[in-house]
Each structure stands twice: as C-alpha cells, then as structure tokens.
C-alpha cells in the first residue's frame, strides 16, 4: 500500500466514525481518568471504551516471559472475564497479549491501550489479536495521533492510561 493510500484510509476511518477522538470535556471520556491531572487531553478510540459500570482489571507484564507466565496470564484473564470483569492491557507480546486472549476466551470484551496511533497495529505480529479485539466488541485506545508509530517514550505514557 502506498503512503497516500494509507493516509486516505486513515482519513476515511476517522471521517466514518470508525475512529473517534474523545476530548477530556466530552461526556464519553472516562470519568476515572478525569480525576488525574496527568491524563491526556484527548483519546483516540477504535471500537469501544470499557464499560464504566463494570469492574476492570489490568493484565500487564513482561514481553520476554516464561511459558508458565504466559499460561498463568491467560488463565487469570479468562477466569476474571468469565466472572464479568473487563481486561485492559497494552497488546505487547508476552503477558499483555495472553491477557487479551484469555479475556476473549472468557467471552468478555478486552481493551488495548497502544503506544502508537490506534490505526497502527504494534507489534505487527499481533494483527489477528488487534482485529479480534475489535470484532469481539472491545476497543483500541491511544493518546497518540493517527499514524503515530511506536516510539520508546510512548510506552511509559501509555502505561498511565492502563
């Protein structure tokens, strides 16, 4: 895909409402985040935001983790999901990805907060997970503008949202 095609696709997603920009003053902006001054002025959202009436648990951890760690992250997220708890994570390789997969296996939406724009799947190897999160009524969330690639300083900032 050429660069102009990518830009046109992003513009189309945004203009058709597939991607929303939610400002802090918007009623849809998560109330819990409004309590903290360090939160971003706006969020970009593809899909849904977590339901504020449901409990939400973050499943986060190492990218380079043991097989045991992967299994446990998946199991905990699945059990929480089966109990009606929403899972939020960063969609990174390792523990984060297993948390999302466990939530989906437990039949609850899951929410990924990215260190890139919501239109940039990172890591690329998680494309199927990214698409499944959206397909299963979850959401992709970021404070990074559309088209922003993953850069090292985005990830600590992303973590405060999780």
Tell where the protein language model's regions lie, with residue ranges.
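Glycine-biased, small-residue-rich flexible motifs in mid-sequence functional cores and linkers
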Residues: 2-5, 12-162
């Amino acid at each position: 895909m050429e660069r102009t095609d990518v830009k046109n696709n992003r513009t189309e997603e945004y203009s058709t409402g597939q991607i929303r920009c939610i400002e802090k003053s918007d009623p849809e902006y998560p109330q819990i985040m409004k309590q903290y001054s360090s939160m971003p002025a706006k969020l970009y959202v593809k899909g849904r935001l977590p339901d504020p009436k449901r409990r939400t648990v973050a499943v986060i951890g190492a990218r380079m983790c043991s097989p045991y760690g992967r299994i446990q992250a998946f199991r905990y997220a699945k059990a929480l999901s089966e109990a009606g708890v929403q899972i939020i994570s960063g969609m990174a390789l390792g523990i984060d990805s297993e948390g999302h997969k466990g939530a989906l296996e437990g039949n609850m939406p899951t929410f990924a907060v990215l260190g890139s724009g919501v239109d940039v799947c990172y890591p690329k190897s998680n494309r199927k997970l990214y698409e499944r999160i959206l397909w299963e009524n979850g959401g992709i969330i970021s404070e990074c503008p559309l088209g922003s690639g993953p850069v090292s300083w985005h990830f600590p900032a992303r973590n405060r949202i999780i």
